[in-house]
């Protein structure tokens, strides 16, 4: 994000684009057992929408607190000591704090860090609802481009499947006809077929994992955080005989609710690489910007009541130094 035209960012993007175009060209020109019009009718639209979504992920970007001037920290030391506080819309809606109850601050970007925001060392900038940094995009997946990233994975899986079926059919026909006794195999076609196998298997697995994450309303970072805190909690329960468990506070209660929260509420939004309708409706507000997130009503009432009290106290009491350790995007619930 800090230098989108650098060599390290251009190389993976050019490589990905060339692989798409090369595989499409070989499929359209080297396959003779399937009508050319049928190949073009299926391959070209799938290729076009996959590449469009690929560059949509890059152009849209994940979003950063730096995009919001009111999240800039003017005095880092004052913010760490509690003398400077984030905007009220963040302080009243923020659910993940440091261990000492203070708001999270990025010492590199000098910004307040909303819920689910993390600093990416590759991009060297804070990312809203950061999921992961993808080297094939040379870009992070975050709040603003997560929907398009999921759609790109689905389009790529479909494209790889079509190429795999067509090339395998052509090679199978060539082998069954005994043509291998008279001519060499088409190595371009064989290379595309092998690449399609590798891409289809790997991207299909990652697509399934990503869709599962969407249905759980969890990011990859939060999954790893949950694992770490779950191990710590098991040690705590064994040591003190407690019976506590971890809960993802951003889980809206059902897979469909979580899916619609990210992908939109209609089939049109799910299939087409367009902005969600709720994002367009809230374009001139702070909603749907990755600055705060919806949670289940029962969880929201419980957490926000304590958060409002903490916010009032932080604005009145004498400040103390702030610890740097972050509290995970989870809630420890007493099961008794």
From Swiss-Prot:
It comes from Saccharomyces cerevisiae (strain ATCC 204508 / S288c) (Baker's yeast). This is Palmitoyltransferase PFA3. Palmitoyltransferase specific for VAC8. Palmitoylates VAC8 at one or more of its N-terminal cysteine residues, which is required for its proper membrane localization. It is found in: Vacuole membrane. Its EC number is 2.3.1.225. Changing residue 134 to S: Abolishes autopalmitoylation and VAC8 palmitoylation. It is a multi-pass membrane protein. One of its GO terms (biological process) is vacuole fusion, non-autophagic. The keyword Ubl conjugation does not apply. Residues 1-6, 59-147, 210-336 are cytoplasmic. Residues 30-37, 169-188 are vacuolar. The keyword Coiled coil does not apply. It holds the Pfam family DHHC. Residues 104-154 form the DHHC domain. InterPro entries: Palmitoyltrfase_DHHC, PFA4/ZDH16/20/ERF2-like. The DHHC domain is required for palmitoyltransferase activity. Belongs to the DHHC palmitoyltransferase family. PFA3 subfamily. GO terms for molecular function: palmitoyltransferase activity; protein-cysteine S-palmitoyltransferase activity. Autopalmitoylated. Keywords: Acyltransferase, Lipoprotein, Membrane, Palmitate, Transferase, Transmembrane, Transmembrane helix, Vacuole. It comes from the Eukaryota. The chain crosses the membrane at residues 7-29, 38-58, 148-168, 189-209. GO terms for cellular component: endoplasmic reticulum; fungal-type vacuole; fungal-type vacuole membrane; Golgi apparatus; vacuolar membrane. It catalyses: L-cysteinyl-[protein] + hexadecanoyl-CoA = S-hexadecanoyl-L-cysteinyl-[protein] + CoA. Its main location: membrane. Present with 2133 molecules/cell in log phase SD medium.
């Amino acid at each position: 994000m800090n230098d989108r035209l650098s060599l390290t960012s251009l190389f993976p993007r050019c490589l990905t684009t060339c692989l798409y175009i090369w595989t499409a060209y070989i499929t359209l020109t080297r396959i003779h057992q399937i009508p050319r019009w049928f190949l073009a009718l299926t391959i070209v639209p799938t290729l076009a929408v996959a590449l469009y979504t690929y560059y949509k992920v890059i152009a849209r970007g994940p979003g950063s607190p730096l995009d919001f001037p009111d999240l800039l920290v003017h005095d880092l030391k004052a913010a760490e000591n509690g003398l400077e506080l984030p905007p009220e819309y963040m302080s009243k809606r923020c659910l993940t704090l440091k261990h000492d109850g203070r708001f999270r601050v990025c010492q590199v970007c000098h910004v307040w860090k909303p819920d689910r925001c993390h600093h990416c060392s590759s991009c060297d900038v804070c990312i809203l609802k950061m999921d992961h940094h993808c080297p094939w995009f040379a870009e992070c997946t975050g709040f603003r481009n997560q929907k398009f990233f999921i759609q790109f994975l689905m389009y790529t899986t479909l494209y790889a499947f079509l190429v795999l079926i067509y090339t395998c059919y052509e090679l199978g026909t060539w082998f069954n006809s005994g043509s291998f006794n008279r001519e060499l195999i088409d190595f371009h076609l064989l290379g595309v077929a092998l690449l399609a196998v590798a891409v289809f298997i790997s991207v299909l697995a990652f697509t399934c994992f990503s869709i599962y994450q969407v249905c759980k309303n969890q990011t990859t970072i939060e999954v790893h955080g949950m694992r770490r805190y779950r191990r710590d909690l098991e040690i705590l329960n064994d040591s003190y005989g407690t019976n506590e468990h971890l809960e993802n506070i951003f889980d809206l209660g059902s897979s469909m609710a979580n899916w619609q929260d990210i992908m939109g509420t209609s089939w049109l939004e799910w299939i087409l690489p367009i902005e969600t309708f709720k994002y367009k409706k809230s374009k001139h507000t702070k909603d749907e910007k990755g600055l705060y997130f919806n949670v289940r009503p029962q969880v929201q009432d419980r957490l926000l009541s304590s958060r409002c009290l903490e916010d009032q106290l932080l604005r009145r009491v004498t400040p103390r130094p702030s610890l740097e350790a972050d509290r995970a995007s989870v809630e420890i619930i007493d099961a008794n």
